[in-house]
Amino acid sequence: QKVKEMKSKVKDLCLHCDVTNKDSVKRAFKIIAETYGGIDILISNAGTAIGGSIAEVNDKILRQSFEDNFFSHQNCASETIKIMKKQNIEGCLLFNISKQSVNPGKNFGPYGLPKSALLNLCKQYAVDYGSLGIRSNGVNADRIRSGLLNDGMIKSRAKAREVSTDEYMRGNLLLNEVKAEDVAKAFFHLAVSKKTTGAVLTVDGGNIAASLR
């Protein structure tokens, strides 16, 4: 339903795709390339928030989290690279990572572990394809209200940290809640930064434990 609503508002191509399935990704990217002639920028945004004590989490759940939060990005990025290499006109990969990749939260390991792997995946693409003019960067955001971090998840994370939901959402150095618009601006900045690759931009209101160099 949401896809239909989006399609009615913008002149865009909306496709159903299981990003954890290589064949599904391949079909979708083939249609994209045929429709627009190629791909200039990939914003890889897939993810599911899965919590649990890491020593006790069900193995099936942990493996599914890696499918959702790591391999989905690898599937999309690898198909994008194939298209970009054929185009031979440079390109840009952008990954929605998470502050969990460098600053894990209590009982949130099933989500944080694949995000840590995703951060390194982002850097690996920068190393492997920089010579082709293909940039790879990421955004480490934190506590953004979305379909992923919904009211129920916010209450759960606030309880784990023994704070109120308002304190949880403003729990940063600036004491300001970070919004989706702030993250969008970060992605745009990286998309147009032609001399930047292998970088991870934090958008979290300030969290020294999650800060990078």
Predicted segment positions?
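Short, small/polar-rich loop/turn modules that mediate ligand/substrate recognition or access, typified
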Residues: G38, I43, G130, R135, ...
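Catalytic Tyr-X3-Lys loop
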Residues: T48, A55-N75, L94, L118, ...
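Residue(s) in the substrate-gating loop at a strand-loop-helix junction
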Residues: S98
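A glycine/serine/threonine-rich, flexible loop-to-helix segment
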Residues: S131, I144-G171, R213
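C-terminal substrate-recognition "lid" of short-chain dehydrogenase/reductases
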Residues: N176-V203, I208
